[in-house]
């Protein structure tokens, strides 16, 4: 009996010594920042920094509260971060460099009224997940999905609500006027599916179709600076004024200003109506307008040359 007791005691002592030799991950005892209490959220991938604040239970861009934000992305990110805050640790951090925490550039920070928790992301493991640490539990390591971490490269302009353009049809189109400071002025009148200028028929077969399908594909710059306006080609923009009968039957003028070619090569920079925001419009939505402008400028330059020769 004594011998059996000794064996049991020895086993218990060995288990105790083994346990003492390992660090245990901290237990989760309720998260200090619950999803329902988040009042601010920001993220960065070291190239972009985007900050949001909750105003009257609605998410706003912290650096422009009047920005036309589609908060679908923010709500999804908030949900994913809320789940991540409840994740269990995978163990204690023995060496920060092993996990990439010594130079972590990607992070999400969430705030309630009293506390901010920052989640920093280090390296990816063999399965493609990212090691994560929390500043309120700096000794513990966690794992985060790659899908979430990739979202940290999302620009605020990717979340912009794009403007709804007027619905132009053959029935409501009246006139289209092209103006540019370089001596361009072309006034087109629509009648029975044809276009005329100064009483003469103008070849513009696809103009109506293009006007019916106008759309902007992305927001490029909100409240642009003078430098950005110039860089995007709006020093001497091509102005397109469309007069049409609106939904209540009265006449309205809608103005589209076309700047330079977009850096991605897929469209042109434009502004819509009185809004100074710069958007991008696909090239194939502007083919007829740009061709009419080019042809008219060419005719003007020929006339000018002939006038100079006669003088």
Explain the meaning of each model-derived region.
Residues 21-311:
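A short-motif feature that recognizes glycine-rich, charge-decorated loops
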Residues 16-19:
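C-terminal motif of bacterial Sec signal peptides marking the signal peptidase cleavage site
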Residues 1-11:
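Positively charged n-region of N-terminal signal peptides that target proteins for export
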């Amino acid at each position: 009996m004594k011998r059996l007791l000794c064996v049991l005691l020895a086993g218990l002592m060995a288990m105790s010594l083994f346990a003492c030799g390992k660090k245990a991950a901290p237990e989760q005892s309720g998260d200090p920042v619950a999803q329902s209490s988040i009042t601010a959220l920001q993220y960065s991938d070291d190239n972009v920094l985007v900050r949001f604040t909750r105003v009257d239970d609605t998410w706003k861009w912290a650096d422009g509260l009047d920005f036309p934000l589609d908060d679908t992305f923010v709500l999804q990110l908030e949900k994913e971060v809320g789940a991540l805050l409840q994740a269990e640790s995978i163990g204690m951090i023995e060496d920060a460099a092993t996990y990439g925490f010594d130079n972590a550039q990607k992070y999400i920070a969430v705030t309630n009224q009293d506390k901010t928790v920052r989640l920093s992301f280090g390296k990816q493991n063999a399965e493609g997940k990212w090691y994560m640490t929390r500043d309120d539990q700096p000794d513990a390591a966690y794992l985060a999905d790659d899908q979430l971490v990739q979202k940290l490269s999302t620009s605020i302009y990717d979340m912009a609500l794009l403007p709804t353009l007027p619905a132009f049809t053959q029935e409501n189109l009246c006139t289209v006027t092209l103006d540019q400071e370089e001596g361009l002025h072309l006034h087109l009148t629509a009648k029975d599916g044809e276009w005329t200028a100064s009483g003469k028929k103008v070849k513009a077969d696809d103009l109506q179709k293009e006007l019916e399908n106008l759309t902007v594909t992305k927001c490029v710059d909100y409240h642009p600076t003078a430098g950005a306006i110039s860089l995007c080609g709006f020093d001497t923009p091509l102005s397109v004024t469309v007069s049409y009968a609106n939904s209540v039957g009265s006449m309205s003028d809608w103005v589209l200003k076309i700047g330079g070619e977009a850096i991605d090569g897929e469209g042109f920079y434009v502004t819509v109506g009185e809004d100074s925001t710069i958007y991008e419009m696909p090239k194939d939505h502007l083919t007829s307008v740009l061709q009419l402008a080019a042809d008219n400028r060419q005719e003007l330059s020929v006339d000018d040359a002939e006038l100079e020769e006669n003088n």
